[in-house]
Amino acid sequence: MVATPSTSAPAKGVVRQVIGPVLDVEFPAGKLPKILNALRIEAKNPAGQDIALTAEVQQLLGDHRVRAVAMSGTDGLVRGMEATDTGAPISVPVGEATLGRIFNVLGEPVDEQGPVNTSDIAPIHRSAPKLTDLETKPKVFETGIKVIDLLAPYRQGGKVGLFGGAGVGKTVLIQELINNIAKEHGGVSVFGGVGERTREGNDLYEEFKESGVINADDLSQSKVALCFGQMNEPPGARMRVGLSALTMAEHFRDVNKQDVLLFVDNIFRFVQAGSEVSALLGRMPSAVGYQPTLGTDVGALQERITSTLEGSITSIQAVYVPADDLTDPAPATTFAHLDATTVLARGLAAKGIYPAVDPLDSTSTMLQPSVVGDEHYKTARAVQSTLQRYKELQDIIAILGLDELSEEDRLTVSRARKIEKFLSQPFFVAEIFTGMSGKYVKLEDTIAGFNMILAGELDDLPEQAFYLVGNIDEVKAKAEKIKEEK
């Protein structure tokens, strides 16, 4: 699965130097491989164990030598070993056969489920779609999750930054989005694990199986393909695994003409790996030690994530902010490409409000009247101003109590608490934990529901009726039930 074979006889070279994950290979005159070609080394180490290693050509050094970056460990590699030019970039399997499977950067399955049953492969390096092929009209991507659709709507073919610490519900939110795109949009998802913990990758896989996102009995019914280059792998693998996942997503968009969700966890690790490789190749570092090609590297990945006339790739990227410094070149470069940000707040998770999306910190470029319409825009802004006022009043309530507020402020607090509760909803993928059936809420139902709360039409209903429900009809039914129980 490493590369498509070239038509001429493959050129063979000899390893002349190995420094960590970087190796220099000498080829015969006139037989030098191209930049980004995959080199394959298959040999035995001094202990008699098999070595099978792929490296990507990064530099042509002169004197018939090339410098390549290994995609796996270089343990046991010695000078004099033979390296073969595959004549093509690293290529990975694509199509339906990838669903439910876990791959490494080279497109090799690592889930012990046997070989991948497909002959379709695609190179991980390709150009972004031409301007004439792009869908330029902004279109909202409905997720069925109230808080996202109302306050920070996603753009179809856009890029979303997902911010949140440990244990606030990132994984569950990702699972729900994968589930909803499959059921409501007939789309599939690709998950790229870039430089994160192997344990987290394994946990995610097990949770996907538990929630039905991966069907272990019939993999063809699965809704996601996974591609991992984890923290313990060499920088070459971490730098390229995002492109491997993106290539799988592009096939679903361009060939199957589907809407695809691409998850990248974590986009910062992609930049970090590029920085390591850049230093190993001897390039002069730029600001804060990052690679001088930072903008180019990030742009090459991000520009391929887009809507075309055939389909779309909507990307949700977890963003780690080093030392919480938003001016660090890595997150700052990433922000330039994002259309929306979804911020998960620990305070909301502590209150039991799931999804714990912060309604005041989350933003979207789509939230403007010309895109979402006047009604949606006005409703969203009214919800945010009500919640903002409630936030301002919380200190007064804590010191003096609710009774000291004016009648108008008491009403604002009451409605804000209902809004906060109504922003929660039960998830399909969490049914096994909550015992409540999941809800997909249409955008028009979401807008209508919040308008009714803001207009005071539901002031007489108890606050608890708004918690973990779908639309307003369910609120009313729950209120009746609470009334009967009393």
From Swiss-Prot:
It comes from Prochlorococcus marinus subsp. pastoris (strain CCMP1986 / NIES-2087 / MED4). One of its GO terms (cellular component) is plasma membrane-derived thylakoid membrane. The lineage of its organism: Bacteria, Bacillati, Cyanobacteriota, Cyanophyceae, Synechococcales. CDD domains: ATP-synt_F1_beta_C, ATP-synt_F1_beta_N, F1-ATPase_beta_CD. F-type ATPases have 2 components, CF(1) - the catalytic core - and CF(0) - the membrane proton channel. CF(1) has five subunits: alpha(3), beta(3), gamma(1), delta(1), epsilon(1). CF(0) has four main subunits: a(1), b(1), b'(1) and c(9-12). InterPro entries: AAA+_ATPase (IPR003593), ATP-synt_VA_C (IPR055190), ATP_synth_F1_bsu (IPR005722), ATPase_a/bsu_AS (IPR020003), ATPase_alpha/beta_chains (IPR050053), ATPase_F1/V1/A1_a/bsu_N (IPR004100), ATPase_F1/V1/A1_a/bsu_N_sf (IPR036121), ATPase_F1/V1/A1_a/bsu_nucl-bd (IPR000194). Belongs to the ATPase alpha/beta chains family. SMART domains: AAA. It catalyses: ATP + H2O + 4 H(+)(in) = ADP + phosphate + 5 H(+)(out). SUPFAM superfamilies: C-terminal domain of alpha and beta subunits of F1 ATP synthase, N-terminal domain of alpha and beta subunits of F1 ATP synthase, P-loop containing nucleoside triphosphate hydrolases. The keyword Ubl conjugation does not apply. Produces ATP from ADP in the presence of a proton gradient across the membrane. The catalytic sites are hosted primarily by the beta subunits. Keywords: ATP synthesis, ATP-binding, CF(1), Hydrogen ion transport, Ion transport, Membrane, Nucleotide-binding, Thylakoid, Translocase, Transport. Disulfide bonds: none annotated. The keyword Repeat does not apply. The gene is atpD. This is ATP synthase subunit beta.
